[in-house]
C-alpha cells in the first residue's frame, strides 16, 4: 500500500536496501526517508536484543563465555553486518546501510519499558481497526 508515514525498525529498511529481499523491496526502500522523532527531547525508543543466564543453567561457565563473546568487537561486527542492528559497544559502527541515513540517534533512556506495556491493549486495538495483521 501507500502511505505518507510509516513506523518501521531501521534494520528492516537496511535489509530491504541490501537487496537480500529482492529488487522490488530494494526499490521500495530507496523511496523511504527515515527519521527519528524526539531527537531534541527524550530521544526515540530502541528495541533491544538481550541475553542472560538462567539460574538453574547446567553450564554457567560456557554461558558466561558466550555472553562475554557477544560483546566483543568481532561478534558485534558480525551482528551489525548480518542483522543491521545497532552495536552495543563503542568502537563498532552501525552497518553502512544504516549510517547512510545520515542521522544521529538519541535513544530514549527516560521512558520505562513498563510504560509501553500499559499501552499495549490500546495499540493492538488501533492496529486491528486499521486492518494490520
List the model feature ranges, each with a label.
Residues 96-133:
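Extracellular/periplasmic bilobal clamshell ligand-binding domains
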Residues 27-55:
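Periplasmic-binding protein-like
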Residues 1, 16-19, 56, 69-76, ...:
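Structured segments of extracytoplasmic/periplasmic soluble domains
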Residues 10-14, 39-42, 58, 72, ...:
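Solvent-exposed loop/turn segments at secondary-structure junctions
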Residues 6, 43, 59-63, 72, ...:
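Solvent-exposed, acidic/flexible segments
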Residues 49-111:
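Mature extracytoplasmic/periplasmic domains
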Residues 9, 13, 35-36, 51, ...:
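Broad hydrophobic/π-residue packing in well-ordered secondary structure
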Residues 1-37:
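Ligand-binding pocket segment of bilobal, Venus flytrap-like solute-binding proteins
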Amino acid at each position: 500500500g501507500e502511505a505518507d508515514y510509516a513506523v518501521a525498525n531501521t534494520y528492516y529498511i537496511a535489509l530491504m536496501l541490501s537487496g537480500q529481499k529482492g529488487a522490488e523491496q530494494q526499490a521500495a526502500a530507496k523511496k523511504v526517508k527515515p527519521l527519528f522523532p524526539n531527537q531534541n527531547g527524550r530521544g526515540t525508543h530502541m528495541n533491544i536484543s538481550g541475553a542472560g543466564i538462567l539460574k538453574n543453567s547446567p553450564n554457567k561457565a560456557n554461558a558466561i563465555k558466550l555472553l562475554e563473546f557477544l560483546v566483543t568487537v568481532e561478534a558485534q561486527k558480525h551482528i551489525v553486518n548480518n542483522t543491521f542492528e545497532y552495536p552495543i559497544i563503542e568502537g563498532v559502527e552501525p552497518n553502512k546501510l544504516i549510517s547512510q541515513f545520515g542521522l544521529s540517534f538519541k535513544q530514549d533512556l527516560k521512558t520505562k519499558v513498563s510504560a509501553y506495556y500499559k499501552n499495549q491493549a490500546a495499540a493492538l486495538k488501533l492496529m486491528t481497526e486499521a486492518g494490520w495483521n
